[in-house]
């Protein structure tokens, strides 16, 4: 067997072993302070993993209970679900409700928060979302991009970048009849104009 492959196997096992395990757990009544707040929501069955974090945690264990099985992840302050296991788990629980149990090590004490629910919709979500990436406030646009995100994983690609146009401001883009085959956006400033993107056969 390849030595590099073996090294990575032992590394992953070692990292998993380093994650603190809950002991002397105290149940609390306040909601789990997870970020982003994914508590009690409905999700499409093809959505990318809902990874989250608890700021200030020194250990974290999350168990998602489905209809017949469960999915467990642990770490320091982040819950990151393996995408392959996540996708197959959601497929098995399509149209059903899942319970999420969060236990976190805060200030030297393990705290068990009340469980919350993820309802898995029987419907899929459209695979892609496009958006304008700009600094908060909209007063400046030194770094401005139009980007496309695959909602079934974390793949992203740049549609347009104002670094390639002399730093011009780019207006929000729109699609014709919600079709990815036809879109447009306006470029302001010197040499500005409306950019039309049309897929041709």
Set out the residue ranges of the language-model regions.
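Sequence signature of WD/YWTD-type beta-propeller architectures
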Residues: 18-201
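Bacterial Sec-dependent N-terminal signal peptides
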Residues: 1-24
